[in-house]
Amino acid sequence: PVTIQGVADNNPAQPFTPVTQHQRPGLLLMDGVVYAAFGAHCDAPPFRGWVVGVSTAGQIRAMFSTRAGDAAASGNGIWHSGSGLVSDRAGSIVFATGNAFGNGSPSTPIPGSTPPPDLGQTVARVTVQPDGTLRATDFFTPFDALTLDAADVDLGAGGPVSLQQAYFGTPAHPNLSLEIGKQGYLYVIDADNMGGSQQGPGGGDLLVNRLGPFGGVWGRPGVWPGDGGYVYIPYNQGSMGVYQYGLDGTGKPT
């Protein structure tokens, strides 16, 4: 066994405090490293979202914090209601975060290619660096992240899903990801350009599409690529939404 301890690679002033961290999402094994994500125990501070990489040889390779802008602040946990971390390309990990508790969510216009140090209410991509550490390289935060935060409507109650390019996507957006959380909107994200914060028209979202709202999700959608492609969404009220993939008149996935 390996004891996870140490400080964040992206903020050495921020220690990992295991007594208030909870490892809920499914693990990811990638290139000989097991990646585990952490959130809170019922939001008891201090906690942050973490992605920790431990090699199969038993060495800690990465400790990435989603709340690196303020070493003392809490928030931005990764919990996904148990659904796992996602890798949709070599050396890359995608996850979603929950409540930021104040100033921990991007709330100004920021391009996706320049992620800020605090990533609350966000779908984020981190990339493995030559030294094994992780660096945020792309992200999407809904324009109304502060409203979600105030109402305890975690985006990260649901985990992200990567869609297979051979069955989904368009010429303009060949690689797609999905995210849906407590609010019930299904965000269709360009996985190559995730959208940043307030990069759309009028300061809105830069997305391939936003569908819904449907019921809130504590989990993540399932995907069937056959028969034209289907997405299955498990709503929190006990029902299952079944949606066939298609394109609208403008070529957007629906």
Where are these regions (language model features)?
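Noncatalytic, solvent-exposed loop/strand surfaces
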Residues: P1-T254
